[in-house]
């Protein structure tokens, strides 16, 4: 079951996925049990939104995509960087102006005083993954409607905010690392891994409902199970080890694409690469490296042996030649010198990463990094950002060019009057490039087709269909 959520008038300024809703209509009548929902931020937050929406539907509430139709609006906020805070506050403001009855949840909700200073009229505020508290507040202001649950059955997969052919699967909450630029542990707590059996049950339901791509997410995916103390769980009557490699192996047996996100560079990441080489999970590694200067990495409290990272990249590619590596970096970190930045550029040129995101350091309220060294001016950060992206654009173009002439499986995401738009194993939704198949207007979202790559640039691929699987 998919639902529509509002699209705030303020467009996103973030380089991360944002699921939003349609603009409010001006002529509407409320029924007393309609809830509007604004979901901002990363895929982990989107999963939280899906969970809240699912329970609302189970409780008999309707979900509307209009402010005017809504009896109450929930805003699930992001508070990771200043731009996210600003956007979240703007979304709350708009919801108050358009509707007036607003509950705020999510990461920014952990900073209630900050929200109250700007928006004192918000009804209630909860922090991240406070599902029961959100529902309790909804029941308070919009009493649970009387309904027959057998006439409004919810699919086993619950409410989804993604297209029906792919879904995010969150395997844990929180993080045990203490990177100095990050406040996630203070917002979401330490690592709390879900039982493996619960994860595999959810994945099975997703695949049985038609999901063809499972995107595994958490704050620290490769740390999955570290908090379990080596204890096994059970699934289908069999013991299952609770670590990321064992979990990935089980997920890979379900017949869908499995894509891993947010892989912290622990040594045991090596164990995942053979699974990619075997074809059990996609040969796609999203591994945020953040910087390459040992001095800056030490200040960030990140792994600082860049030589080992380069050796690992070479080793991974030898084991799995098709491996696509995505990473993110921060430029303008406090105390970053031109020498540090040049080390980062040299690393890019040597590592030849496939997909790279770059963020200018943001002085996140509460981050230790704000006070450990002199802050970098906005002009310098902007200059380094553009120089970084210029270097990476050439590398990305080179890496994508290797696909020209090859035939790949393409998962179709959208079709318009010009043709179909899809993704290969090398492309995660929302954040990576796309594969354009011009003229193929008869294809449908969710179809998996074989297509020969004919052209590439630094972001995207173009292809011609060779064969199509007509099953959605």
From Swiss-Prot:
Pfam families: Radical_SAM, TRAM_2, UPF0004. The keyword Transferase applies. GO terms for cellular component: cytosol. It is an enzyme of class 2 (transferase). It is found in: Cytoplasm. GO terms for molecular function: 4 iron, 4 sulfur cluster binding; aspartic acid methylthiotransferase activity; metal ion binding; protein methylthiotransferase activity. InterPro entries: Elp3/MiaA/NifB-like_rSAM (IPR006638), Methylthiotransferase (IPR005839), Methylthiotransferase_CS (IPR020612), Methylthiotransferase_N (IPR013848), Methylthiotransferase_N_sf (IPR038135), NA-bd_OB-fold (IPR012340), Ribosomal_uS12_MeSTrfase_RimO (IPR005840), rSAM (IPR007197). Signal peptide: none annotated. It catalyses: L-aspartate(89)-[ribosomal protein uS12]-hydrogen + (sulfur carrier)-SH + AH2 + 2 S-adenosyl-L-methionine = 3-methylsulfanyl-L-aspartate(89)-[ribosomal protein uS12]-hydrogen + (sulfur carrier)-H + 5'-deoxyadenosine + L-methionine + A + S-adenosyl-L-homocysteine + 2 H(+). Keywords: 4Fe-4S, Cytoplasm, Iron, Iron-sulfur, Metal-binding, S-adenosyl-L-methionine, Transferase. Its cofactor is [4Fe-4S] cluster. Residues 33-143 form the MTTase N-terminal domain. Its EC number is 2.8.4.4. One of its GO terms (biological process) is tRNA modification. Its main location: cytoplasm. CDD domains: Radical_SAM. [4Fe-4S] cluster 2 binds at residues 175, 179, 182. [4Fe-4S] cluster 1 binds at residues 42, 78, 107. Residues 401-467 form the TRAM domain. The keyword Metal-binding applies. Residues 161-398 form the Radical SAM core domain. Binds 2 [4Fe-4S] clusters. One cluster is coordinated with 3 cysteines and an exchangeable S-adenosyl-L-methionine. Catalyzes the methylthiolation of an aspartic acid residue of ribosomal protein uS12. Belongs to the methylthiotransferase family. RimO subfamily. NCBIfam families: 30S ribosomal protein S12 methylthiotransferase RimO, MiaB/RimO family radical SAM methylthiotransferase. This is Ribosomal protein uS12 methylthiotransferase RimO. It comes from Shewanella baltica (strain OS155 / ATCC BAA-1091). The gene is rimO.
């Amino acid at each position: 079951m998919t639902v529509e959520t509002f699209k705030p008038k303020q467009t996103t300024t973030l380089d991360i996925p944002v699921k939003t809703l349609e603009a409010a209509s001006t002529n509407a009548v409320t029924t007393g049990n309609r809830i509007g929902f604004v979901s901002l931020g990363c895929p982990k937050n989107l999963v939280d939104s899906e969970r809240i929406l699912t329970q609302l539907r189970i409780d008999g509430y309707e979900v509307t995509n209009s402010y005017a139709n809504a009896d109450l609006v929930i805003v699930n906020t992001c508070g990771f960087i200043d731009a996210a805070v600003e956007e979240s506050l703007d979304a709350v403001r708009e919801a108050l102006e358009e509707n007036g009855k607003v509950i705020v949840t999510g990461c920014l909700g952990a900073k209630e005083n900050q929200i109250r200073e700007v928006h004192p009229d918000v009804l209630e505020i909860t922090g991240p993954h406070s599902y029961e508290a959100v529902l309790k507040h909804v029941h308070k202001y919009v009493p649970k409607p009387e309904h027959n649950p057998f006439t409004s059955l919810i699919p086993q997969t619950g409410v989804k905010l993604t297209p029906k052919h792919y879904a995010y699967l969150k395997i844990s909450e929180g993080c045990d690392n203490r990177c100095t630029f990050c406040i996630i542990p203070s917002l979401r707590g330490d690592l709390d891994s879900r039982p493996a059996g619960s994860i595999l049950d959810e994945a099975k339901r997703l695949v049985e409902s038609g999901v063809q791509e499972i995107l595994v997410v958490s704050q620290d995916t490769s740390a999955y199970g570290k908090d379990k103390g080596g204890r096994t769980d059970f699934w289908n009557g069999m013991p299952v080890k609770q670590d990321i490699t064992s979990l990935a192996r089980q997920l890979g047996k379900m017949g869908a694409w499995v894509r891993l996100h947010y892989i912290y560079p622990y040594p045991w990441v090596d164990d995942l690469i053979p699974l990619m080489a075997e074809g059990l999970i996609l040969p796609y590694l999203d591994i945020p490296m953040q910087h390459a200067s040992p001095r800056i990495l030490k200040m960030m409290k990140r792994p600082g042996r860049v030589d080992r990272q380069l050796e690992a990249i070479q080793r991974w590619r030898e084991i799995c030649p098709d491996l696509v590596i995505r990473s993110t970096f921060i430029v303008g970190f406090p105390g970053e010198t031109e020498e540090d930045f040049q080390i980062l550029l040299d690393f890019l040129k040597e590592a030849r990463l496939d997909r790279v995101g770059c963020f200018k350091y943001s002085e996140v309220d509460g981050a230790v990094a704000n006070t450990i060294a002199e802050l970098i001016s906005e002009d310098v950060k902007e200059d380094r950002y553009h120089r970084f992206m210029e270097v990476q654009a050439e590398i990305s173009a080179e890496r994508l060019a290797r696909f020209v002439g090859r035939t790949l499986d393409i998962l179709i995401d959208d079709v318009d009057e010009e043709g179909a738009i899809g993704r290969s194993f090398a492309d995660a939704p929302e954040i990576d490039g796309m594969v354009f198949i011009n003229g193929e207007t008869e294809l449908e979202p969710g179809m998996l087709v074989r297509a020969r790559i004919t052209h590439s640039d630094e972001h995207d691929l173009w292809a011609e269909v060779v064969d199509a699987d007509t099953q959605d």
